[in-house]
Regions:
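ADP-ribosyltransferase catalytic core
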Residues: 210-278
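Intrinsically disordered, low-complexity, charge-biased terminal/linker regions in eukaryotic proteins
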Residues: 1-98
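Extended aliphatic helical segments
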Residues: 20, 40, 47, 125, ...
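Intrinsic disorder/low-complexity signal
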Residues: 3, 169, 178, 225, ...
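Helix N-terminus capping/helix-initiation residues
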Residues: 62-63, 115, 243
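ADP-ribose/NAD+-binding catalytic cleft of ART/PARP-like enzymes
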Residues: 72-76, 80-221
Length: 278
């Protein structure tokens, strides 16, 4: 691919996006460098409309902690998480999947983003935003490779016999965006850090200076706001201005269920980053 042309158009490589998604913007736009620099809200098709009563009730609650509690109560009710037999779950089944909900996916990701829960969340990003999974236990450029087959197997294991898991993640993203807009109404970006071992772990579109790169991130990534924390995960520190609209999860979003985690879950696409030693 002609990198000069790609830089001028700020477009994703063809193998990094799907032609369709379930979002108000196509992947080619939301995954572009222009979007990183000038973000706009991302809305998943029909999610807020379907759950409009939740968001109306949240408008009446001033405390973010109480809003989180209300959100989790709603999730339990809407997806029958406390009454899964009503959703068709068979407790006598050979494989128990009664705890495979959105919280299980988050905890699994935070423990190991290359595990089966991580695969399920990357698959969800593919479906909803059209950003392809580029790395899972290794690069996934070859769809006939063992790595890609292992990724598909992990997805199948994570999604098997779950209760509308993708719909749960849809609502998690929509709630996260609601909280961000409510708490930071005039802010568009947040400075975040990620530890890496080498820049070539990512597809580099262009090197602008010794430390500045334009590259393609995996479709879902962990970042932190703590530079020292990022240093624990690699020899180099990647710094980026991340659009708030690309956040699926932020620290403290669900304080009663996920305590002490300092990770931000960030949607991928093209980003301009700065690379440095600690």
């Amino acid at each position: 691919m002609n990198t000069d042309k790609q830089h001028l158009t700020h477009s994703l490589p063809c193998d990094a996006h799907l032609p369709v998604n379930h979002c108000n913007l196509p992947a080619l736009i939301l995954g572009s460098l222009t979007f990183q620099q000038h973000p706009v809200p991302l809305n998943l098709d029909g999610v807020k409309e379907m759950h409009i009563e939740l968001f109306r009730s949240l408008e009446t609650i001033n405390s973010s902690k109480q809003r989180a509690e209300s959100f989790q109560d709603y999730m339990r009710s809407a997806f029958l998480l406390d009454h899964l037999e009503e959703a068709g779950f068979n407790p006598a089944g050979r494989r128990r999947r009664d705890k495979a909900d959105y919280l299980r996916m988050l905890r699994g990701w935070l423990f190991n983003s290359d595990g089966k829960e991580g695969a399920a969340m990357k698959s969800w990003v593919e479906s909803r935003f059209g950003l392809r999974t580029l790395n899972h236990h290794g690069l996934l450029r070859d769809y006939m490779s063992e790595h890609y087959l292992a990724y598909l197997i992990d997805c199948a294991k994570a999604l098997y016999n779950t209760n509308a898991l993708n719909a749960q993640l849809d609502l998690l993203y929509t709630y996260c965006q609601y909280e961000i807009r409510r708490q930071y109404p005039s802010q568009q970006h947040i400075r975040l850090y990620r530890g890496i071992n080498h820049i070539r772990e990512h597809e580099v579109i262009r090197q602008l200076t010794k430390h500045d790169y334009v590259l393609v991130l995996n479709n879902l990534n962990s970042f932190t706001s703590n530079r020292e924390r990022a240093d624990e995960f690699g020899d180099y520190i990647m710094q980026a201005q991340i659009p708030l609209t690309k956040l699926l999860y932020t620290p403290g979003l669900l304080p009663a269920s996920l305590k002490g985690e300092d990770e931000y879950l960030v949607l991928g696409g093209i980003h301009q980053v700065q690379l440095s030693f600690f």
